[in-house]
Swiss-Prot record:
Keywords: Cell cycle, Cell division, GTP-binding, Magnesium, Metal-binding, Nucleotide-binding, Septation. GTP binds at residues 38-45, 65-69, 83-86, 150-153, 183-185. The gene is engB. The keyword Nucleotide-binding applies. Necessary for normal cell division and for the maintenance of normal septation. Belongs to the TRAFAC class TrmE-Era-EngA-EngB-Septin-like GTPase superfamily. EngB GTPase family. It comes from Escherichia coli O1:K1 / APEC. This is Probable GTP-binding protein EngB. One of its GO terms (molecular function) is metal ion binding. Pfam families: MMR_HSR1 (PF01926). Gene3D superfamilies: P-loop containing nucleotide triphosphate hydrolases.
Length: 215
């Protein structure tokens, strides 16, 4: 039986800190960060707004691929959520795609305060090549992963469970700390499990301390 995680974190108090085009423009690499990544139409902004119970914390757009910057939000002192650029949208110019990929890869490989990665995938189209690449990057860097199968309300219960079981089976091949859950911003499904996972990461992970060496 699942118990509700006790936490002193109030996600409704999460506030926007800054946007950055790449890792060099981010604030000091200290504390704990949990990043949200996903294809441009995976529902990333909606998930962040649902998590924090704020309608416009993260901008949602009818045009997938609008999030071109790394966006930082503070939950509490030294505890941040990071909205990474959406990837994989066909109509984005090739050069911009490469730029985003570089920024994503650099952030995942070099950001020491990154302790957890939430990868969002449309439950109807999970585990595309770039989704798998994100999970591989995280596992190779010993970063824990939570896969959220979004838009779960689009499928009937039986199909939803089948997709969940299929993806859970598939991610075993990554040989890492990869958990998979269903999520629906519309129905508020899976929000408690997301908060519990974030609570665990923010409370159990070791925060990165300030050092004298700068990059």
């Amino acid at each position: 039986m699942e118990t509700t995680a006790l936490t002193n974190l109030n996600y409704q108090q999460t506030h926007f800190v800054m946007s950055a085009p790449d890792i060099r423009h981010l604030p000091s690499d200290t504390g704990i960060e949990v990043a949200f990544a996903g294809r441009s139409n995976a529902g990333k902004s909606s998930a962040l707004n649902t998590l924090t119970n704020q309608k416009s914390l993260a901008r949602t757009s009818k045009t997938p691929g609008r999030t071109q910057l790394i966006n930082l939000f503070e939950v509490a002192d030294g505890k941040r959520l990071v909205d990474l650029p959406g990837y994989g949208y066909a109509e984005v110019p090739e050069e911009m795609k490469r730029k985003w990929q570089r920024a994503l890869g650099e952030y995942l490989e070099k950001r020491q305060s990154l302790q957890g990665l939430v990868v969002l995938m449309d439950i109807r189209h999970p585990l595309k090549d770039l989704d798998q690449q994100m999970i591989e990057w995280a596992v190779d860097s010993n970063i824990a992963v939570l896969v959220l199968l979004t838009k779960a309300d689009k499928l009937a219960s039986g199909a939803r469970k089948a997709q969940l079981n299929m993806v859970r089976e598939a991610v075993l091949a990554f040989n890492g700390d990869v958990q998979v859950e269903t999520f629906s911003s519309l129905k508020k499904q899976g929000v408690d499990k997301l908060r519990q996972k974030l609570d665990t990461w923010f409370s159990e992970m070791q925060p990165v301390e300030e050092t004298q060496d700068g990059e």
